[in-house]
């Protein structure tokens, strides 16, 4: 079994003295893991977020297999000096590595990850919007999508103020106010991003949106064993608070 593709490196683990296990999210073959040779003398050490051309080979598709790769571009320089960007890259790549099924193409998630990473590379002032869209898309593609288009009870699309923590659906102010203590707030920014509206936002809007999305990630994916993901999520919120 042998194929070639292009992808984004989302995890690297050392394996022995001269090998690494790489997780690459590819365009046509989805998430794939494989062994690759590691050399301290290499001109470029593979990093999270690198774009690579890869050749994967194995006797069976279910086997770990081996990678040969060629660097297309490195994005490390564009995020490593910004702790918030680094943590967002870290959280998104780790959770993709943990929850995506192998050998299943998902161009929708791949495209969102690609747009997010490129927004950082090209210093897009709206990179945070691209990140929220990535998280919304990941939840949706894995079967836990939010529905922020209209109220789940009366079907109105006006005054959507809350989100049901059970269903992930929006609830209008009129319907939800008596039950506000048991509902999640619906941040205006998250509503705008979901519905592809124009947006203006502050760090508070970004933080509130991440808190809501974080609730659903914890509900569906993050257990007590996912200490690294929980740590990354907490660090993202702390870093937002430190911003001017």
UniProtKB/Swiss-Prot annotation:
> What is this protein identified as?
DNA repair protein RecO
Give any Gene Ontology cellular component. bacterial nucleoid
A Pfam cross-reference name: RecO_C
Entry keywords, A to Z? DNA damage, DNA recombination, DNA repair
Question: What family does this chain come from, according to its entry?
Answer: Belongs to the RecO family.
Query: What NCBIfam families has UniProt attached to this entry?
Result: reco
- Give the species this sequence originates from: Ehrlichia chaffeensis (strain ATCC CRL-10679 / Arkansas)
Regions crossing the membrane = none
Example GO BP: DNA recombination
Q: Its biological function?
A: Involved in DNA repair and RecF pathway recombination.
């Amino acid at each position: 079994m042998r194929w070639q593709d292009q992808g984004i490196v989302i995890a690297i683990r050392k394996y022995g003295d001269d090998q690494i296990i790489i997780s690459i999210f590819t365009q046509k073959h989805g998430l794939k893991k494989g062994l690759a040779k590691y050399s301290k003398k290499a001109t470029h050490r593979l990093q999270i977020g690198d774009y690579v051309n890869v050749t994967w080979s194995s006797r069976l598709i279910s086997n770990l297999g081996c990678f040969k790769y060629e660097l297309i571009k490195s994005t490390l320089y564009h995020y490593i000096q910004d702790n918030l960007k680094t943590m967002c890259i870290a959280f998104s790549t780790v959770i993709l590595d943990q929850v995506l099924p192998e050998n299943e193409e998902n161009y929708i998630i791949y495209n969102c990850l690609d747009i997010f990473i490129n927004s950082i590379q090209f210093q897009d002032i709206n990179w945070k919007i691209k990140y929220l869209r990535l998280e919304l898309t990941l939840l949706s593609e894995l079967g836990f999508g939010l529905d922020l288009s209209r109220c789940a009870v009366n079907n109105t699309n006006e005054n959507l103020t809350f989100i049901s923590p059970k269903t992930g659906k929006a609830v209008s102010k009129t319907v939800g106010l008596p039950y506000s203590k048991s509902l999640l707030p619906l941040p205006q920014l998250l509503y705008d991003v979901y519905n592809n509206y124009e947006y203006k936002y502050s760090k508070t809007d970004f933080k509130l949106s991440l808190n809501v999305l974080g609730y659903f990630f914890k509900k569906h994916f993050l257990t007590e064993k996912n200490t690294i993901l929980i740590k990354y999520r907490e660090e993202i919120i702390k870093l937002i608070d430190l911003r001017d």
